[in-house]
Amino acid sequence: MIKKLGFRNILRNRRRSIITCMIMGLGLAALIFADAFLHGLNQNMITSVTDSFIGDGQIHRKDFLRTRELEKSINDSENVFKKISEDPKIKLAVPRTIANGMIASPTDVLPIALYGINAIEEEKISSIKNSIKLGSYLDNSDPIQLLIGDKLAKFLGVTIGDKVVITMAQAQTGILSQEMFRVSGIFKMKNKEMDSSLAFININKSQEMMGIGNNFHEIVFKFKNKSDVLNPPSELLKLYSENDNEALSWKKLVPAIDAGIQLTSYSLYIGSFILFAIIALSTMNTLFMSLYERMYEFGIMKAIGTRPLFIFKLIIMEACVLAFFSSLLGISVGGIATIVTKWIGISHLTDVEYLGTTIKTAIRPIPSLTQYIVYPIAIFITAILSSIYPAITAARIIPSKSMRRD
């Protein structure tokens, strides 16, 4: 009985009911799409950071990232590398050496961060090889090959095949070490800092120049499970943070990205609160308008003995009917929008720098089951809560006053 009356009362003024359903439904659709888009944006940023160069995590000597002292190579480097390479949670690990130095061409001298890498292993964990725009990638058999960024090449006035001189101080002794290299490749990683200040050579040559033997300054690793990327296991990081070494996840290495992801979550919460407030006011407004149009009707119902609880339930049911059709509309529109944009991809933000990283691929919204369960349930709860006041008002109607014709 209550269901039939509630449904009929909603259809009594179809235009108002349709407008209210559209407000609630399109609001729900916007919320579903925004949630999926932000999940896709966050995943895109994480992938851009971890797959480009940083990896899912890194191991260094304590304070190395702050001081960049050549002497601060990883303690027991080879054993640590072997141990993490065999760890069941680790998909891949590669070593690197890092040194600050100067690079000189016939036209200019500039400071650089020089990385020594194993060319074969490095291409499995970073996008250096895929970022080569001119020339070729490093060959482990050629010790004088050099990779530099396109902006650095422009500053130095060099191109493929040109020779440059790199100078650095050796570990322990501080004696200057100078070597001539040939530019074999020019990369563009779409990051201003990397493209203007990084250079790569073969790791064996870098160890020789730095005078650090078989040691290295950095071990970059990737997790096997995607869940570990989003929530790095603290036990694993603690395991490799021994003997004056330090294992850090990408969240600690690039805190701006992690903060940005948290900020997008807070933004979604604030947006959701505002949206649900609008939905609540719209529902309350619709129910009150319907209530005042039917004051005479409710007065008659009270006069013939209808209980206040019945009228209270009737108004609540009307709100539930509105929420039901609004949820169907919101789920349909939000789902279609998410599926279409996931298939097409949002490429307008490609190559845009955000929080220190560059969005390199099209953003694809990521749908989840919670978007289609939690948000519709929230719509129902909001509709029910916002209908309580109109329902109480209707239940307390005094027949003699409501039936009066002035």
Q: Predicted regions: what is each one?
A:
Residues 1-32, 42, 48-51, 309, ...:
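N-terminal Sec/SRP start-transfer signal
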Residues 13, 364-406:
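C-terminal membrane-exit region of the final transmembrane helix in multipass inner-membrane proteins
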Residues 22-24, 265-286, 324, 329, ...:
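Internal alpha-helical transmembrane segments of multipass membrane proteins
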Residues 35-113, 136-142, 238:
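Hydrophobic, regular-secondary-structure patches
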Residues 97, 110-117, 132-204:
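Hydrophobic secondary-structure segments that place a key small or acidic residue at a functional site
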Residues 170-268:
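Mechanotransmission and gating elements of multispan inner-membrane complexes involved in transport
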Residues 288, 296-342, 382:
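Transmembrane alpha-helical interface segments in multi-pass membrane proteins
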Residues 313, 328-374, 388:
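Short helix-loop junctions at transmembrane helix boundaries
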